[in-house]
Design a protein with these regions (language model features):
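Pre-Walker A adenine-sensing motif
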Residues: 53-61
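Glycine-rich phosphate-binding P-loop
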Residues: 66-91
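Glycine- and acidic
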Residues: 19, 24, 36-42, 60-72, ...
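Short beta-strand-centered segment that lines the nucleotide-binding/catalytic pocket of NTP-utilizing
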Residues: 93-110
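Short acidic-glycine loop/turn motifs at beta-strand connectors
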Residues: 60-64, 109-115
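A short alpha/beta connector and helix-capping loop motif
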Residues: 113-125
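Conserved NTP phosphate-binding and transfer environment spanning the P-loop NTPase/kinase superfamily
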Residues: 3-4, 128-133, 138-146, 150-419
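Charged, amphipathic alpha-helical linker segments immediately N-terminal to NTP-binding catalytic cores
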Residues: 1-53
Length: 419
């Protein structure tokens, strides 16, 4: 493995991938990001379908009615957690159910009924191990109990089990770390800092059929029909908890401006906005402007379009604390999204799109979240968004061939903010 001579090459026109001297999962497991997103996105553009970096989940209500949504998030935004969500107790008691069709990749095409249909081309989950535990994501952890490959985690030599940071508070005393060195949970480096046993990007590779909440449509050849597409990012103040786009092209605009703010203090740059359109920035196999145009053109072919939403679980108060509880309680936002898809609730128009009426977000059983909290989470700060519009303009300026439709959406946004 030579860092100086490391090549990951994709030749979309020839349907060829070459990976040399890499040991990074996404660049060596060539069926995953390299083929199923980079090459497949190019094939999809030419053949009239879409390869997207999206989870697919099913939501069943107490009447037994099932709806499916696809969702795209940049890394570190809880995509796998959402794909395997366990609803709050109050929802479970009523009979709501969440099923996972896929946690990472969706191949999407227009069905004969004019709806968008999505399949998960993968056979399992390639998940980040550190931080996965029975509280953060029980379904992911339970998926790893058999027929699972673990890479770069701690090996407990006493009972031949695995461990990683964030699994529990009991690291093994007689183990080897991800580099193969002896490790006992209390190793320090030359500066006296603790040495982690598992690599931060260590992984588990588990068959999807192991997952307790895997959908019975997981292997359906036609896939599942999408009622909604959800985009998301990590924003402290800008984006509200949830908003709905005004139409398909506006939804493509919302996806194209997806962003997260950097949180790692170690890099020294906190709060820097990193644009990651549709969470596909590392995976688009051709020109980004042409990719946006493909989304616009797909909209022209879909008779029964899914509605498009944006969510932000990461709004913070002035002390930097998250306001929304997240995790299983994100079900409450999915609930509203499905209600909007079925025209069961009204919404309030803002310069950026439609936000819920605060009373339409179910807060039953939430201790620290009141109607006023929800109102705060749904505010659209016009001055903040004027700055955001400048950032979007700058981002569009860095891309070639941005479709005129998206430039028009940006102009509309600016006009709405100045009304």
């Amino acid at each position: 493995l030579s860092e100086e001579k490391r090549y990951i090459m994709h030749f979309p026109e020839e349907n060829t991938i070459m990976s040399i001297n890499s040991n990074y999962g996404g660049n060596v497991l060539l069926g995953k990001k390299c083929f199923a997103l980079r090459i497949a996105s190019f094939l999809g553009k030419n053949e009239g379908w879409m390869a997207e970096h999206m989870l697919i989940l099913g939501i069943t209500n107490p009447k037994g009615e099932k709806k499916y949504v696809a969702a795209a998030f940049p890394s570190a935004c809880g995509k796998t957690n959402l794909a395997m969500l366990i609803p709050p107790k109050s929802y479970l008691e009523k009979g709501y159910k969440i099923e996972c069709v896929g946690d990472d990749i969706a191949w999407i095409r227009v069905g004969e009924d004019g709806r968008l249909w999505a399949v998960n081309p993968e056979n399992g989950f390639f998940g980040v191990a550190p931080g996965t535990n029975m509280k953060s994501n029980p379904n992911a952890l339970l998926s790893t109990m058999k027929n699972t490959i673990f890479t770069n985690v701690v090996q407990n030599l006493d009972d031949n089990t695995v461990w990683w940071e964030g699994l529990d508070k009991n690291p093994p005393k007689n183990a080897i770390d991800w580099k193969g060195n002896p490790w006992n949970g209390d190793v320090k480096d030359a500066d006296g800092k603790p040495v982690k046993g598992a690599h931060p990007n260590s992984r588990f590779t588990a068959p999807a059929i192991n997952c307790p909440c895997i959908s019975d449509q997981f292997e359906a050849p036609n896939g599942v029909p999408l009622s909604a597409i959800i985009f998301g990012g990590r924003r402290a103040k800008t984006a509200p908890l949830v908003y709905q786009s005004k139409d398909w092209n506006n939804g493509v605009f919302v996806g194209s401006i997806m962003a997260s703010e950097t949180t790692a203090a170690a890099t020294g740059a906190v709060g820097v906005v990193r644009r990651d359109p549709m969470a596909m920035r590392p995976f688009i196999g051709y020109n980004m402007g042409d990719y946006f145009k493909h989304w616009i053109e797909m909209g022209e072919k879909i008779a029964n379009k899914p509605k498009i939403f944006n969510v932000n679980w990461f709004r913070t108060d002035d002390n930097g604390n998250f306001i929304w509880p997240g995790f299983g309680d994100n079900m409450r936002v999915l609930d509203w999204i499905i209600d909007r898809c079925e025209d069961k609730v009204d919404a309030i128009e803002t310069p950026i799109g439609f936000v819920p009426k605060a009373e339409d977000i179910n807060v039953d059983g939430l201790e620290d979240v009141t109607l006023d909290t929800i109102k705060e989470l749904l505010t659209v700060d016009v001055e903040n968004w004027k700055k955001e519009a400048e950032g979007i303009e700058q981002f569009y300026g860095e891309i070639t061939r941005v479709p005129e439709e998206l430039k028009a959406e940006l102009a509309n946004l600016k006009a709405n903010l100045n009304k």
